[in-house]
Amino acid sequence: MLIIGHRGAAGVAKENTLESLQAGLDAEADILEFDVHTTKDNVPILVHDGNLRRTHKTRVSVGQSTLNQLQKVADKTDYPIATLEEVLDSFFGKIILNIELKQRDCAKHVVKLLKKKYIKKPSDWNLVVFSSFYTSELKTVRKLSQDANLWLLHNRNPFIFIAYARRLGLNGVGFHRLYVNDFALEIAKKTDLFTYAYTVNRPHSAYLLSRKGIDGVVTDRPSTILTEINRRQA
């Protein structure tokens, strides 16, 4: 079972920062997951919410602010804002990167950056994965690259992927940890989809999911989960 570091390693460092991603890499996660929005001037940055209220204690909107404006806000705190380009410069090629597209209309800017600077040959697409709850964003990625890996995220209904698997050419499906349905899991596996659950922070829960045959778990504490899985398999 693969360990996917949630927002890097959000349980041990500030989420969606270079520090958190490095912590996930150091913890020997198999994949690093992080969230991407685009700024008013179309720069992809790492942030989970549409505003900075939770992370920076201000209601400043991400999509209505330029990168420069957002960085000025961040400079007044101890919470840096990383651009996707900075992240790719630091981690592309070292580990598989799971880019979650959190905002409508951001996919095209993300793919443009990847094609411009990082993707040099078709096999390079295997170094990144795109995930989203928005099928429209995954559709955009697929239009721009037939080689991209697409994972559709689900909330309560674990069967939504069935309607989109062939249409979007999905490669994987992410289930909410509380709604991992055995039948849905079976269908996904029969259609050769990578299956994973989010966000799993209890070691025993991760172990039970591994027994179900799920392929991966997203966790804030990759080191803790990895240690438990290895202990049980020893």
Language-model features: locations:
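Phosphate-group recognition and catalysis centered on beta-loop-alpha active-site segments
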Residues: 1-234
